[in-house]
Every structure is written in structure tokens, then in C-alpha cells.
Amino acid sequence: MRRGRLTAAALAAGALGGACATWPMHAVPIGTAAAAECAPRDTRPGPRPEWARAKRATILVDSVLLGGVPALRTELRGWRTATVGRPAIMLPAAEAAIRSGGRVAPLAIVGVGYNSLWERGRRNYAGWAERFDDGARGLVRALRARGARQVVWVTLRDAGRGVIPSGALWQFDAYAWYFPYVNERLRRLDRIRDDLVLAEWDRVSKRTGITYDAIHLNPRGAALMARTIRAAIEAEADAQRPPPPCPPETATARS
């Protein structure tokens, strides 16, 4: 997720402002200089980041996202994708798979976290959270070391019993209690990293008819997850575009 950062440009601007304090000043009507310098084309933002323009993605899966890969490939038409992972994979094994594999694409789409260890009622939560955080950070480091420049991590489904198929309520009762714990840790990771953004499956999956059990996708759910991931990619790619040289209100047509 992109956040406010103190950039080198801002530091340079501050230093220049101090240096210019003693320069001669000339009064210019507000907007005159900007209008003279800006053309309509100058109001367009800069290009998308390289990771988005490359249109190559590595998809790291457990059984949930694995079921959505065909729909995701359809949604990402024009992208080259490779899938890594397996059902029931845990974070340490996912990191090992990345480190022992080949080059990772500039965009990594991560759909793991269902297979993690916790205790009910937040018992020993701090210790289990630290363990999860270490695993998640290690995985992101491995992805970066292998070539990823942007990570999109899919959150876990966090829905009530009322939207779960009746035959899968046992699964919901056995496992779904810790899915919010995982999402809490992923949101924390998102807050502290500029190279990671969340595809918020937990927010869009609170509905019926998208899974055949508590978590695994049916075709409708696979299509919804694919759209959710694509939306996260598009939003982050646009957010990372450099701002236009001139605000739209200062642009004037040139003959």
C-alpha cells in the first residue's frame, strides 16, 4: 500500500526553499506562470510502474487460490503467469519453494495463510502472531530476492455461518475462527510495506453461492476472486503513477 513518504524530492525542495530565501522576488499574478508553462498533455499522470507494464505474474497458491487460477488467468488476459505452491502449504514451505525455484515475475500474487497455527480465544496470540509475521516477512523477502517488485496478497475469507453451505458448517466451526487473526497480521504487514497491497477477499466474500464448502471456490467465487485481485492490481498500478507535471486547472491549450 502506498503511504505518505518523506522523499528526496521533498527534502530537496525544502533545501532549495531555504537557499532561495535571499534571491530577488518578482510579483507575478497567481496562475500566470503556470498557465504559460502548462499544456493539456502535461496534466496526464506518468506511466505505470515497471512491474505493471511487464505484465508478468507469479501466483503463489494453496488450495483456495489454486481453484481460482483458471479464472485469474482469464481476468489477466495478456499477462504471462506461472503458478507455484500446492494445497495445504504453510508459510515456511512457501518460502522454501520460492527460494529453491527460478526467477519470480515482477508481480507476485500470494494466496496463502489458511494453513497457519493459532489457539482459540487469542490464547498465546502474541507468540503465534510473531511466528506468522516472521513467516510472512520471510516469504516477502524471498519473493523480492527472486525478482518480485510488487506483492498482492489475498486476504482470507471472513464470513458468518449464515453464508456457509450447511454441509460445510463443521469446517467453518473447526477453522474459520482464526481467519480474522491472519487478516489482522496481513493488514499490519500492508501498513509497514510500500511494496505490498491486499486484495481484500474478506470484504467481498461475505455472501452465499461462491464456495462449495467454507472456503474453496466454485466457478462464481473463482470469478469474483479474480476480479478482486485484478482490481487491487489496477488500483495500485494507478496509485504508483507519477503525478502530472501540472494540475489540470493550470493547463491551457497551445496552438
Predicted regions and their residues:
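N-terminal secretory targeting modules
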Residues: 1-58, 236-255
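Conserved SGNH/GDSL esterase-like catalytic core that processes O-acyl groups on lipids
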Residues: 37-134
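Extracytoplasmic/secreted proteins, especially bacterial periplasmic and envelope-associated proteins
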Residues: 59, 67, 71, 93, ...
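Extracytoplasmic/secreted cell-surface and envelope-processing proteins
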Residues: 67-68, 117-125, 161-166, 206-212
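Sec-exported extracytoplasmic/periplasmic mature domains
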Residues: 77, 102, 113, 141-148, ...
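Histidine-centered active-site loop/cap adjacent to the catalytic His
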Residues: 94, 210-255
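Active-site segments of SGNH/GDSL-like serine hydrolases
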Residues: 111-117, 142-176
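Substrate-gating cap/lid alpha-helix
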Residues: 160-200, 219
